[in-house]
Swiss-Prot record:
GO cellular component, one term: DNA-directed RNA polymerase complex
Family annotation (InterPro entries): DNA-dir_RNA_pol_insert, DNA-dir_RNA_pol_RpoA/D/Rpb3, DNA-dir_RpoA, RBP11-like, RNAP_asu_C, RNApol_insert_sf
Keywords: DNA-directed RNA polymerase, Nucleotidyltransferase, Transcription, Transferase
Record family assignment: Belongs to the RNA polymerase alpha chain family.
Organism: Paraburkholderia xenovorans (strain LB400)
Reaction(s) this enzyme catalyzes, per UniProt: RNA(n) + a ribonucleoside 5'-triphosphate = RNA(n+1) + diphosphate
Gene Ontology molecular function, alphabetical: DNA binding; DNA-directed RNA polymerase activity; protein dimerization activity
Entry function: DNA-dependent RNA polymerase catalyzes the transcription of DNA into RNA using the four ribonucleoside triphosphates as substrates.
Name listed for the protein in its UniProt record: DNA-directed RNA polymerase subunit alpha
HAMAP family linked: RNApol_bact_RpoA (MF_00059)
Organism lineage: Bacteria, Pseudomonadati, Pseudomonadota, Betaproteobacteria, Burkholderiales
One Pfam family this sequence matches: RNA_pol_L
Enzyme Commission (EC) number: 2.7.7.6
Region (Alpha N-terminal domain (alpha-NTD)): 1-231
């Protein structure tokens, strides 16, 4: 009798739009389609890292219940429209951008003055309509985060949020807009009781649907790894002793991270040649590296996070035998 579980594979990725895709995976043992599909869906909706406006300062406005002369939208609707702008930051965790426009016409996300390491994914998104003589001057703080953070959490927790005229927004950081899944029947040879998992994913364009699935799977693996490391159980005692397996990504050189030349050279100067060497260093240790500043550190952290890794991780039996230095 077969006791090993079938291992599924992705058999199709169908693009349904620029940021919309359907991913089909099979075969799963019976029941595993719902088990894994629901887990992935929950992680996709709650745990993806993204970017969102968190604070807004509008010239001439003291609170969100104000109106502006020459602007069709009131401040509440203006804030709702600003929350619909999709930002993406590169190698930084926050930035403040400016929106200035005057004269009759439509104000869109493309009118926002951006820093070199910030971009707007939906520049055609409408923010406001100005009439003759209308003027808009807005400062927008954009931050990196995860999930949903109500504005009142920061409003009462940060002194900067108490400044008169600064409006704190509820922030939805998740780059995933919609996720659904369906479980269908699958067949392998004579077995007809297997599952096929079909996932439908739509993002806001900050990440692709395929990358969203990869990141959610890494999060699940990381969270479940603690259970695999349980000690003192009967199963562990009976298991044959063998050297722990090392994630292949840790054996890859830091050059594969495609860091800037400055960051890569700083790491090599500290004898950090492999990704496994890098993740064991803490932020404080890296900041002590000559010529490696906060900007380079943020770049390294972001690149590692995109692969489900962080600084300060602990590895047993590192470096493995036979690893060239």
């Amino acid at each position: 009798m077969q006791t090993s579980l079938l291992k599924p594979k992705i058999i199709a990725v169908e693009s349904l739009g620029e940021s919309h895709a359907k991913v089909v995976m099979e075969p799963f043992e019976r029941g595993y389609g719902h088990t894994l599909g629901n887990a992935l869906r929950r992680v996709l909706l709650s745990s993806m890292i993204g970017y969102a406006p968190t604070e807004v300062t509008i010239a001439g406005v003291v609170h969100e219940y104000s109106t502006l002369d020459g602007v069709q939208e009131d401040v509440v609707n203006l804030l709702l429209n600003l929350k619909g702008v999709v930002f993406k930051l590169h190698n930084r965790d926050e930035v403040t951008v400016t929106l200035r426009k005057e004269g009759e016409g439509v104000v869109t996300a493309g009118d926002i003055e951006l820093a070199h390491d910030c971009e707007v994914i939906n520049p055609d998104h409408v923010i406001a309509h100005l009439s003759k003589g209308g003027k808009l001057d807005v400062q927008i703080k954009v931050e990196k985060g995860r999930g949903y953070v109500p504005g009142n959490v920061r409003r009462y927790g940060e002194e900067s949020a108490k400044i008169i005229g600064r409006i704190v927004l509820d922030a939805s950081f998740s780059p995933v807009r919609r996720v659904s899944y369906a479980v269908e029947s699958a067949r392998v040879e004579q077995r007809t009781d297997l599952d096929k998992l079909v996932m439908n994913i739509e993002t806001n364009g900050v990440i692709s649907p395929e990358e969203a699935i990869r990141q959610s799977a890494r999060i699940l693996v990381d969270q479940l790894s603690v259970f695999a490391a349980l000690e003192g159980t009967e199963a562990t005692a009976e298991a044959p002793s063998r050297a722990p397996q090392i994630d292949p990504i840790l054996l890859r050189p830091v050059d594969d991270l495609e860091l800037t030349v400055r960051s890569a050279n700083c790491l090599k100067a500290e004898n950090i040649y492999y990704i496994g060497d890098l993740i064991q260093r803490t932020e404080n240790e890296l900041l002590k590296t000559p010529n490696l500043g906060r900007k380079s550190l943020n770049e390294i952290k972001e690149v590692l996070a995109s692969r489900g890794l962080t600084l300060g991780m602990k590895l047993e039996n590192w470096p493995p035998a036979g690893l060239d230095k």
